[in-house]
Amino acid sequence: ASGRCLDTPAEPVGSKLCERVRQTSYPVIERSGVLFGWFGAPDKAPPFPAFDCFAAPSTHVFAFKGLWHCNWLQAFEVGIDPAHTSFLHRFLNDAPLAAIGINPAGKQFRSASLGDFGGEQWPMTRVMREFHQPDISFEARPWGLQITTLRSMTPELTHVRVTHGIFPQTFVIPLSPTLTITQMHVPVDDTHTYWFSFFTSFA
């Protein structure tokens, strides 16, 4: 939409007001079921981010949102904390995808697996539950922050997770060899935040 007024029916016949009135408009595009608008100068719009969740076909992305009653920075901080999953997302048992049912959307966390190593299955739920004191390191990157998390599981096996914090509001988490989560935290005001989450499957 260009913002051009098409009609002013309450104006007298012959009025040219509608030709002079314009509503401010902003370009909007849709990606993975979410609308994105650029509110800055039209000639200064940056390239749209080439994240996996926007490049993958819609059949491989599940997106949802929620309204959180907290500041966006609080939401961002808890999401990039690699230790919180061992406590706030702890499952006492593990479930393969086949056991979740016919609609697995949003439940992939429970079925994500590192595979079979040394005759043992290592679903992510087990990794998070049994190894809750990881070694965490941080490195500055041009886009923000890289967080490397190491969970030593056996003398031969270490779980490595690299999270990218893309400032000011996005981070990408690799959940398994075939699944990533991209989260965005959009401030509404000082105490409310819209949280957008994109599960992208490469399977």
What are these regions (language model features)?
Residues 42-203:
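C-terminal catalytic domain of Rieske-type non-heme iron oxygenases
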Residues 1-62:
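Rieske [2Fe-2S] iron-sulfur-binding domain
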